[in-house]
Amino acid sequence: MYEYFKGIISKITAKYIVLEVNSIGYILHVANPYAYSGHLHQEAKVYVHQVVREDAELLYGFATEEEKQLFLSLISVSGIGPVSALAIIAADDNAGLVQAIEQKNITYLTKFPKIGKKTAQQMVLDLEGKVVAADGLAESKAPVQTVDNQELEEAMEAMLALGYKATELKKIKKFFEGTTDTAENYIKSALKMLVK
């Protein structure tokens, strides 16, 4: 088992990053790959969890130890696998997730991909009182400004019209939240991120 890898982020895709450690490139599946864009071709420390299956060995990466612990808590719940756990972490500020578990808010929990009522109830049963918000994540995902960014919205709508997937665009949009730019520049930057 591995605790973390320290290496150079050499590639970023919509689903994973590649971390080069001692001339070996490791594919790390992460919640929001574009959050690592500022560290492309730079050294980074990424916490990891290894999943060994009959047909594959997969590595999941996390920005903080708290994010990794939240992931491990989620996959301990019957009905939640690694892919679903990453989707939950990517879609929420984590503080909201923990609050929903503590308040037994089944409706809130069922908004996550592939989480039905039964799995949401199991989450509450298994995790109530056992999880804490990943503080670093909640802080880093909070938008710097709360006003609507019309230019960013326009850019995302244009890219959706061009055929890009909404799931990819959602991750990119999160990366740009709190910034100010023109729709044209947002599109150019987003295209660069998508082709890397």
From Swiss-Prot:
Residues 147-196 are annotated as: Domain III. Residues 1-63 are annotated as: Domain I. Its main location: cytoplasm. Residues 64-142 are annotated as: Domain II. It is found in: Cytoplasm. Keywords: Cytoplasm, DNA damage, DNA recombination, DNA repair, DNA-binding. SMART domains: HhH1. GO terms for biological process: DNA recombination; DNA repair. This is Holliday junction branch migration complex subunit RuvA. It comes from Streptococcus gordonii (strain Challis / ATCC 35105 / BCRC 15272 / CH1 / DL1 / V288). The gene is ruvA. HAMAP family: DNA_HJ_migration_RuvA. The keyword ATP-binding does not apply. Disulfide bonds: none annotated. Belongs to the RuvA family. NCBIfam families: ruvA. InterPro entries: DNA_helicase_Holl-junc_RuvA_I, Hlx-hairpin-Hlx_DNA-bd_motif, NA-bd_OB-fold, RuvA, RuvA_2-like, RuvA_C, RuvA_C_sf. Has three domains with a flexible linker between the domains II and III and assumes an 'L' shape. Domain III is highly mobile and contacts RuvB. Homotetramer. Forms an RuvA(8)-RuvB(12)-Holliday junction (HJ) complex. HJ DNA is sandwiched between 2 RuvA tetramers; dsDNA enters through RuvA and exits via RuvB. An RuvB hexamer assembles on each DNA strand where it exits the tetramer. Each RuvB hexamer is contacted by two RuvA subunits (via domain III) on 2 adjacent RuvB subunits; this complex drives branch migration. In the full resolvosome a probable DNA-RuvA(4)-RuvB(12)-RuvC(2) complex forms which resolves the HJ. Pfam families: HHH_5, RuvA_C, RuvA_N. One of its GO terms (cellular component) is Holliday junction helicase complex. The keyword Plastid does not apply. The RuvA-RuvB-RuvC complex processes Holliday junction (HJ) DNA during genetic recombination and DNA repair, while the RuvA-RuvB complex plays an important role in the rescue of blocked DNA replication forks via replication fork reversal (RFR). RuvA specifically binds to HJ cruciform DNA, conferring on it an open structure. The RuvB hexamer acts as an ATP-dependent pump, pulling dsDNA into and through the RuvAB complex. HJ branch migration allows RuvC to scan DNA until it finds its consensus sequence, where it cleaves and resolves the cruciform DNA. Signal peptide: none annotated.
